[in-house]
């Protein structure tokens, strides 16, 4: 998460005849935990998470040198909504659909707009590129112990406590602190959304005026079919004019497109592009070994 280390979304324009070789170079970095092909001029999109901003930027520079491709670096500036929630046992067409108890625009009691109309906290959280996290030794050990998940046992916290050599109560207190600080977003099952039928996803980038970003981002983050919403910088020197990113996950491509049409017509009347994911090149969890160490 952005409260530990320094991360960025990045992209390259990989020529088709070198696409696989370039993907191999990028995926070879353990600091790269996601890489996707998207149907756009910028056709490889990956995430780099390193122990420091300097190390992150050095990796991007190495990728440029080794691939011969310009890197479009787009670190997160503001988080409006990030929480992938996929229904497993019902027929919902979109992630978060069942959580929408009423229209986002429908006033709550007292006539005031309810920022949690769909059970969603879509407030603006500004992100530092230099976040390091102020971890105790136990918290660092705990993150390393659970980075691949808690043990699937009747006593997962006791098992982890034994692994890190701490009392169970101390582990529970540390987990509470890590959750409160955002180092651990949630504890639960990780759902493979593709297996559950959510095979269509689209990253939509929007040219939203700077003075409207927070208001638009918070409003869109409350929509029940938007799974991610965040602000990233424009890069006009690389012909990248987009500042707001949204993700829509659904079971059918046509339904996803229809929701994006609705998003453009009713909420974001600005220029935009749709970048559909067409291939997963790499997808792993973030590795904490470097992030919890000094330097890196």
Enumerate the predicted regions with their spans.
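A compositional/biophysical signature of low hydrophobicity enriched in polar/charged and small residues
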Residues: 1-296
